[in-house]
Amino acid sequence: MDKKHCTLESINLSGCIILDKDVSGVEFDGADFTYARFERVNFTGCSFENCVMENTRFTDCRMTDMQVEGCRMFGAEFVGGELTGTEFRDCGMQSSGFLHTDMEKVAMVHCERHGMLFYSHGQREQILEHSSMEEI
């Protein structure tokens, strides 16, 4: 799946396990990632628009300078890895978790965040200080 700088529309990766890939620069539009698992995947510069990422798990992934807009992300988990410079806009992120994830300069704009979990020593202070998150 090393398809850099392309657009993937309405692709169904529901339940897939993707390991050790570089998909930097890919635009995902209307993709379904429900219950998918990504480990050590490089998503640098990717965009996700109107995707379903419910109960999707991202482990030790590099997710820098991404745009995520209009996505359903109920129960998504981000474990380890990096989310630096990423913007989430108009996403449903209820019950999502960010565990031991570097989240410097992350923006969550007009996102539903009820029940979100942030877990890492000192991470809550980092998020409040360096991210624009409405009504934490």
Walk through the language-model features, giving the residues of each.
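Tandem repeat scaffolds
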Residues: 1-136
